[in-house]
Amino acid sequence: MSDTHELSLTRTIDAPPEKVWDVMVNRLEEWYCPAPWRAEIDRQERRAGGRCEMTFYGPVGEAMPQNGIYLAFDEGRRFVSTDAVVFGEDGDFEPAGPMMIGFWEIEPEGSGTRYTARARHWTEESRKQHVEMGFEAGWGACADQLKALCEA
């Protein structure tokens, strides 16, 4: 896939990778959605092919389901999900309106951790739409929230 359809950001976190990973996966609701919005996990199956379902709630009652599947869940290193596939009412995979494949990755860097979030899109139009939706501000706020939790 061409990297022209990818958006990414990186943060250096002054905490060991083990702590960052723990916060990433066990305190997801505290950092995964930019405040004042909040995320609630509806269902999370931490394995490739597992459900990744949550709802984002806005400050005036908005609700935005965020459903998909994990493509990879590499303990201590990364998780990858997509909204291109969801589970239907019969419990089987169904196609959905794809926007992206999301990557959330960590790796040791000095005495801390490098956190990288990437969004790969099927088309340039989809990538541009994500930029217009506020990728840098929104995903940047989430990364900063994660950083603050890990460094506290």
PLM feature segments, named:
Residues 6, 89-137:
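Beta-strand/loop substructures that line and gate deep hydrophobic ligand-binding cavities in soluble
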Residues 20-24, 28, 52, 70, ...:
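Hydrophobic pocket/interface hotspot
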Residues 1-39:
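Hydrophobic ligand-binding cavity/cleft-lining segments
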Residues 13, 24, 56-58, 85, ...:
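Short beta-strand segments enriched in hydrophobic/aromatic residues
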Residues 32-33, 40-48, 53, 59-110:
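Hydrophobic-ligand binding "helix-grip"
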